Amino acid sequence: MSKRDYYDVLGVAKDADKKDIKKAYRSLANKYHPDKNPDNPEALDKFKELAEAYEILSSDDKRAAYDRFGHDGVNGQAGGYGGAGAGGFSDIFGDVFGDIFGGGGGGQSRTRRGSDLRYTLELDLEQAVWGCEEKIRIPTLVNCKTCDGSGAKKGSTPKTCGTCGGAGQVRMSQGFFSVQQTCPECHGAGQVISDPCRDCHGQGRVQEYKTLNVKIPAGVDTGDRIRLSGEGEAGTHGGPAGDLFVQVSVKPHSIFERDGANLYCEVPISFTTAALGGEIDVPTLDGRVRLKVTAECQSGKLFRLRNKGVKPVRGGPVGDLICKVVVETPVNLTSRQKELFTELAESMGEGTDHSPKQKSWFDGVKRFFDDIKK
């Protein structure tokens, strides 16, 4: 009888990742588990098929061979139910279903790496652009100095677990299966502590606050992460420490907005400067510069100052500062100033020669109403 496609067996797409494959297998294998279907031989066959499919698709090498050559590429490599041996199906079953049946978990190592930590660091825009060094204080778990991380009272030592013989796991029979589970006595440590340390209560770790100096490279932006290896929580039973990930968050700036390597700002200019032109001071992150405003400048016009932006942290050219001019309408006018504006308005007449956008707008309105009348 020809075998079904392994992807169809698990009900996953051919580009499914390991997480989705494991999730699908776990759900279906739990459904067709022989212990739940003791009088259903079809369920047992289905369970065998699921186990075989998962063994192939959960292995990068076997999956690659299967994707290329189909079942011919993996013949003899799938152990299936009852054929995988000590390192085959029982390991798969323990990895996937350990928590359902009271423990499990593949791997024999008793050491455990410490957890990674994350710290969100708020920076001013200037700090992010130029780089800086910041001091942070984080809560973490460190090795207990009293017992040197052993968890045992000073002068005593942990003893080999009598239940698992130091392996950290025990083999349990459940129905048709012999599976490995985490030892219920030592919880996987392989050792038991009869006289625990008073400071860490046998855990081997205590909580402390740790102060670190973090060097922030120039050009970072919100969302960037800085990894500090070994600065996470201490491992257990001699395991390595985790890492600390510093997440950058740049605070809003009162003048500038950042988009990648470019900076943006609005620059207010007077009515007369917009009409006649002139030079104005524009702020940049490294000082003021003079910007020449052309005559008859309209509100919203953009001026680009080359290389006045940000040099990206991952390399590349320095960005630009893009200035958007905003023409301000004069306020708090004196009587004389109002007279002058009245004279100016009269000199311009009723036409729109001096207001090209206004003329374009009125032309558009006229076409709109002409179309309605048709």
Curated annotation (Swiss-Prot):
Keyword set includes Zinc-finger: yes
Highest taxon in the source lineage: Bacteria
Subcellular location: Cytoplasm
SMART domains reported for this sequence: DnaJ (SM00271)
Cofactor note: Binds 2 Zn(2+) ions per monomer.
Residue spans of the CXXCXGXG motif repeats: 144-151, 161-168, 183-190, 197-204
Residues where Zn(2+) 1 binds: 144, 147, 197, 200
Location, primary (coarse class): cytoplasm
Residue ranges of domain J in the record: 5-70
Keywords: Chaperone, Cytoplasm, DNA replication, Metal-binding, Repeat, Stress response, Zinc, Zinc-finger
Zinc finger map (CR-type): 131-209
MF terms (GO), sorted A to Z: ATP binding; heat shock protein binding; unfolded protein binding; zinc ion binding
GO biological process: chaperone cofactor-dependent protein refolding; DNA replication; protein refolding; response to heat
GO cellular component assignments: cytoplasm
PROSITE patterns found in the cross-reference section: DNAJ_2 (PS50076), ZF_CR (PS51188)
Keyword Membrane: no
Chain positions recorded as Zn(2+) 2 binding sites: 161, 164, 183, 186
Required co-factors: Zn(2+)
SUPFAM superfamilies in alphabetical order: Chaperone J-domain, DnaJ/Hsp40 cysteine-rich domain, HSP40/DnaJ peptide-binding domain
Pfam families according to UniProt: DnaJ (PF00226), DnaJ_C (PF01556), DnaJ_CXXCXGXG (PF00684)
NCBIfam families for the chain: DnaJ_bact, PRK10767.1
Family: Belongs to the DnaJ family.
HAMAP family: DnaJ
Subunit structure, interactors included: Homodimer.
Chain's role: Participates actively in the response to hyperosmotic and heat shock by preventing the aggregation of stress-denatured proteins and by disaggregating proteins, also in an autonomous, DnaK-independent fashion. Unfolded proteins bind initially to DnaJ; upon interaction with the DnaJ-bound protein, DnaK hydrolyzes its bound ATP, resulting in the formation of a stable complex. GrpE releases ADP from DnaK; ATP binding to DnaK triggers the release of the substrate protein, thus completing the reaction cycle.
Protein name: Chaperone protein DnaJ
Organism from which the protein derives: Marinomonas sp. (strain MWYL1)
Gene encoding the protein: dnaJ
